Regions:
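Accessory RNA 3′-end/elbow-binding domains used by RNA modification enzymes
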Residues: 3, 18-21, 55, 60, ...
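RNA pseudouridine synthases
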Residues: 1-167, 243-244
Length: 264
């Protein structure tokens, strides 16, 4: 559960970019238990006494910050020889998986409960794409020596989208009935607000629509100095957003197009 950006219309062109964004999760680890799925929905594999203190938990968790080679879980949608891993796992087949390099930008321990019968650690993880939080919990448990699995998970951020700004499905349905849903839709170019905005001369509109390279003289807006490999939001002469271009060697090269022929 948690933040899930939804792309509509031409905005579906953002999907491949969104998957590359960093994400933030809040997770609760259950100490002393391991399962085949690495979370509490799976079959219990081991149960061990939890004989660690808070200092050890903090030290071990801090060791996972930075780059980290993570072995994907068997219960995942990754494919090996054309077969999804979870299909193999359900058939009782386990195959070797190659470690994948992920990045844990930060791992904050919010709460450590070692007093109750159910011993838990609550963490907030800021990470790169492709990171399995339940596998992270399992790996932390291994280093602690008692094992662990994920008890709960909530995605609180995807890129610039944070959970405080999200709408529930019920809220979306209610807004749609009132005809107010468009007030909450983020325009495509707003997604690139960190990029500088440039406008082309009308003479170059056709080149722009076709995704051709654009010379410096095509730009009529004052963009200041252009840095090599810098990305820009490019608009046509009428002020409509067309796409993302990258400045390379004195010209602008298409990075991502959001224009189609139906726009004219």
């Amino acid at each position: 559960m948690g933040v899930l950006p939804v792309c509509l219309g031409k905005g579906t062109g953002l999907v491949s970019m969104i998957t590359d964004w960093t994400k933030t999760y809040e997770a609760v680890m259950l100490l002393g238990t391991t399962t085949d799925t690495q979370d509490t929905s799976g079959t219990v594999l081991t149960q061990s006494a939890v004989e660690v203190d808070e200092r050890t938990v903090l030290e071990v968790c801090s060791q996972f910050e930075g780059e980290y080679d993570q072995i994907p879980p068997m219960y995942s949608a990754l494919k090996v020889n054309g077969k999804k891993l979870y299909e193999l796992a359900r058939a009782g087949v386990e195959v070797e998986r190659k470690p994948r390099r992920v990045v844990i930008n930060s791992l904050r321990v919010n709460d450590i409960n070692l007093e109750d019968d159910v011993k838990t650690v609550t963490i907030t993880v800021d990470c790169s794409k492709g990171t399995y939080i339940r596998t992270l919990c399992d790996d932390i448990g291994k280093k602690l020596g008692c094992g662990a699995c994920m008890m709960s998970l909530k995605r609180t951020r995807v890129g610039d989208f944070v959970i405080d700004d999200t709408l529930t499905l019920n809220q979306i349905a209610a807004l749609a009935l009132k005809g107010e849903i468009e007030d909450y839709i983020v325009s495509i170019d707003e997604m690139f607000s960190d990029y500088r905005k440039l406008t082309v001369d009308a003479v170059y509109n056709r080149l722009l629509y076709n995704g051709n390279k654009l010379p410096l003289e095509a730009i009529v807006s004052d963009g200041g100095e252009f840095l090599d490999m810098e990305k820009f939001r490019i608009y046509d002469a009428e002020g409509s957003f067309v796409g993302i271009y990258k400045y390379i060697g004195g010209q602008f090269v298409l990075e991502k197009m959001f224009y189609d022929n139906s726009d004219t």
